């Protein structure tokens, strides 16, 4: 609906019976305390209240949805490199965005390498990603032939079974770290599973990083317009600038992913969305998380 009545909104936010109907795993995987904490936090901000109602209860308010960046604009920015070519010794810092979607979505880690170019006085950016799809989701996907092609070519990873195992994500990060990739901040959606984030924190501490610093390296990024709007505008500026400030890896999925990404505009704010269930934008969500972390590191965002 475009709007919901105040009493309906309050029922969603307070009724434990409604929660149980929406989430049968309540009390098993997800606890009431999680809902209570998210709702208490959201009541302080109208945008966050919209996000909580959308994500926790599957009730959506609609805004104006428009296309964003087409794949044809991304292809000229792609180069024959991967994130492992962007090392600390060459001055590159890497921001990581993680979208641990479930079901038939992709399980994605996006990387954004950033370096200051002393000759031009500008920042340089490079984006790459790792993504997985569940075998069960692949078998039912309208995009199966396309996904199978990318899997065969090594661009998309296949995860057996019906459940994502977050060890795959940690293994990917470990491999990047061992190859000299300097990952400085990790953005994630706090409305998704906390297990991968707990594993991430444990791995960072195993590297000898103090627990307090680990907490500052792992940054929650909510997928609502208030958080995404600055990152969307920045990324759009980088991509559409006459000079090539940002490049993308040679992964052929990039143009398809960007074409899937639509923008919902409401109250002069923008957030990422998609047109059809089979459209995948998880990697782009991760890229926005990377941009958010970059701004956070540079003091442009306060949490």
Placement of each model-derived feature along the sequence:
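Beta-sheet entry/capping signal
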Residues: 1-3, 92-96, 106-108, 123-126, ...
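Short glycine-rich phosphate-binding loop at a beta-alpha junction
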Residues: 180-197
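Acidic, metal-ligating active-site segments
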Residues: 103-119, 281-290
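Conserved helicase motor "Helicase C" RecA-like lobe of SF1/SF2 P-loop NTPases
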Residues: 193-213
């Amino acid at each position: 609906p475009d709007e919901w009545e105040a009493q309906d909104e309050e029922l969603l936010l307070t009724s434990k019976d409604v929660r149980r109907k929406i989430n049968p795993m309540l009390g098993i995987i997800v606890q009431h305390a999680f809902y209570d904490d998210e709702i208490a936090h959201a009541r302080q901000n109208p945008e966050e209240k919209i996000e909580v109602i959308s994500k926790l209860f599957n009730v959506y308010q609609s805004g104006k949805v428009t296309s964003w960046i087409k794949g044809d604009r991304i292809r000229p920015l792609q180069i024959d490199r991967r994130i492992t070519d962007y090392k600390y010794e060459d001055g590159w810092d890497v921001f990581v965005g993680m979208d641990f979607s479930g079901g038939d979505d992709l399980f994605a880690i996006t990387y954004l390498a950033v370096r200051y170019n002393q000759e031009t006085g500008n920042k340089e950016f490079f984006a790459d990603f790792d993504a997985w799809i569940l075998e069960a989701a692949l078998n039912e996907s309208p995009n199966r032939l396309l996904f199978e092609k990318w899997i065969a070519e090594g661009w998309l990873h296949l995860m057996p079974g019906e459940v994502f195992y977050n060890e795959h994500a940690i293994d990917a990060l470990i491999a990047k770290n061992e190859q000299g990739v300097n990952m400085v901040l990790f953005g994630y959606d706090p409305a998704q599973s906390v297990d991968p984030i707990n594993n991430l924190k444990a791995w960072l501490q195993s590297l000898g990083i103090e627990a307090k610093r680990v907490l500052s390296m792992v940054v929650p990024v909510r997928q609502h317009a208030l958080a995404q709007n600055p990152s969307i505008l920045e990324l759009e500026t980088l991509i559409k600038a006459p000079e090539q400030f940002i490049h993308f890896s040679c992964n052929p999925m990039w143009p398809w992913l960007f074409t899937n990404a639509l923008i919902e505009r409401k109250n002069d704010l923008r957030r990422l969305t998609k047109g059809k269930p089979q459209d995948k934008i998880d990697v782009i969500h991760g890229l926005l998380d990377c941009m958010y972390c970059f701004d956070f590191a540079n003091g442009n965002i306060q949490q």
